[in-house]
Amino acid sequence: LSCPDQQITWLRNLLGNIGNVFHVGTEPGLGQSMKLANNLLSAAALAITSEAMVMGVKAGLDPHIMLEVINAGSGKNTATQDKFPKAILTRSFDRGFTNSLMHKDVELFLEEAQSLKVPTGVASAVQKLWQTACSEIGPGADFTTIVQCVENRAGVEVKGT
């Protein structure tokens, strides 16, 4: 949250039962900037993990073993710990967030970064993959279907056994 210091206790009491409450500052807009940064990291983690997993499976690696190794090392992230084992390897694609919403979040990050004159080379690449997911897989499809964009180009499917 971004709010005056004297309001944070009241807001923590009000919102603490429905989620984590962090006070990121007092200036208006800081909460939004924090949310955009977090959402970009989530989008990038899922996109890059999709590429890594597709490469590994195409090379002959077992996706379950890949996740076990990655999650024991420095590459672990929310995609490897949650989305791949629960929604992608199972092919359920059911995390409840759409490609269009993730694409919108990345677009909003890029707009904010541009207004602050922050370079966005990696974020721009992430945005392009989400745009592809919207056009090829569908804007209303679950955001975990982004792996299918990479799978389709590589000619391999990442799935559990």
Residue ranges and their predicted role:
Residues 63, 120, 140, 157-158:
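Residue-level detector of short coil/turn "hinge" positions at structural boundaries
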Residues 22-24, 100-104, 155-161:
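Electropositive, surface-exposed helix/loop patches at the edges of structured domains
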Residues 141-161:
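Short, basic/aromatic-enriched C-terminal tail that caps enzymatic domains
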Residues 1-34, 41-77, 116:
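Internal alpha-helical scaffold of NAD(P)-dependent oxidoreductase catalytic cores
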Residues 32, 82-143, 150:
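Interdomain hinge/lid region at the active-site interface
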Residues 40-41, 54-55, 97-98, 135:
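A generic structural signal for short
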